[in-house]
């Protein structure tokens, strides 16, 4: 019995190569793997992109079959291959690096070759027997990388969008719940890291929920507006060369049906092939969310600082020992990690922006970097938001006595008294308190500027944290 061959020979315009016998990709994918050893992140790292590529190929095959250009047996085999990819099979065969030259041709050929070889086996042939079903002639029929790839990127983003929104919404709800829990905890608000006026810890956390809620609403509206127009059918530059006149409409209709997304043909296929503006805007929205998350995490780190020599108004749940040399130290590792994710997303947006600007004439060859950065930003943000909610926000507790102590000893409390004792008295009390180290309330009582009943009324939390003004007595 002869040993099973460990490789097969495939050829292209540059010559021949040995392809591993068990590989469903082919020679062009192998060349790309050998050429682009850059990020170390293969296409399979982003399953939604792989699924989207398979959906594009299925839609193209359906349209070509309906138009009479693709035989039934080939259509059936391609359909089976695409269905398996959509289910999650064979994703490990998508081995090309996310960063690549060629405007995404390596990605497109990785998909074409994998689908072709799965289909060949379904037809009873062996991998590489392309005379029966060809990656270019059949799987890539009526397509160019320049319309199939950007369409798949848009679709992949849409397919993963709901998961991102769900993570953001869950984080918002966690902040909102803390807003309710801490509604009665009076504390000092701060501006420029200096004491300002009283507020509640609940108001502070509610504001976190509100600012992220704004981004949730915008992201919900933005993706359907930006990403549903596709250039599938435009082929090389948007003119539709080598495609049946009826292909574009049918292919987009089939892709919408297969994916469940409200896809529609771009109004100007040449513009849609060359312009990356939709990705720039969508990435900018992801950056905005990252900026907000980072600012919130800055606040959480400050508010939990100490525990003895910092603000120490809240306790973050301890996640791990914080130092190899300082016993007992616990660091705010979860907010710190989210800060770093935010910096990465901000950097991704800049790289994507430069790639979008780097296009020339009818095509932007930098689209692989655009795809890599935007999928990476989504993955990082989703994971960071889940981590922040699960390992930090839900376990935060308030140091109620510490919050009250800081309010009582803050010079900022004089602002609440200003309408009742006047600006000059308030300024003098504040100055004396600072110089002597005594409390504002102690000095007000000593000088009998207000009676106890009035003072107690002013100092009620509900009266200090919302608009309220009683005229000065004559």
Curated annotation (Swiss-Prot):
Role according to the record: Catalyzes the reversible conversion of L-aspartate to fumarate and ammonia. Can also utilize L-phenylalanine to form cinnamic acid. Exhibits the highest specific activity towards L-phenylalanine, but catalytic efficiency is 3-fold higher with L-aspartate.
Q: Which reaction equations make up its catalytic activity? A: L-aspartate = fumarate + NH4(+); L-phenylalanine = (E)-cinnamate + NH4(+)
Q: Which residues bind L-aspartate?
A: 105, 144-146, 191, 324, 329
Q: Which gene encodes it?
A: aspA
What is the name of the protein in this document? Aspartate ammonia-lyase
Q: Which EC main class describes this enzyme? A: lyase
pH dependence per the entry: Optimum pH is 8.0.
Q: Region SS loop: which residues? A: 322-331
Recorded hits in InterPro entries, A to Z, give:
ApsA, Aspartate_Ammonia-Lyase, Fumarase/histidase_N, Fumarase_C_C, Fumarate_lyase_CS, Fumarate_lyase_fam, Fumarate_lyase_N, L-Aspartase-like
Describe the thermal dependence of activity: Optimum temperature is 35 degrees Celsius. Retains 80% activity at 15 degrees Celsius. Shows very high thermal stability, and retains about 56% of its activity after 7 days of incubation at 35 degrees Celsius.
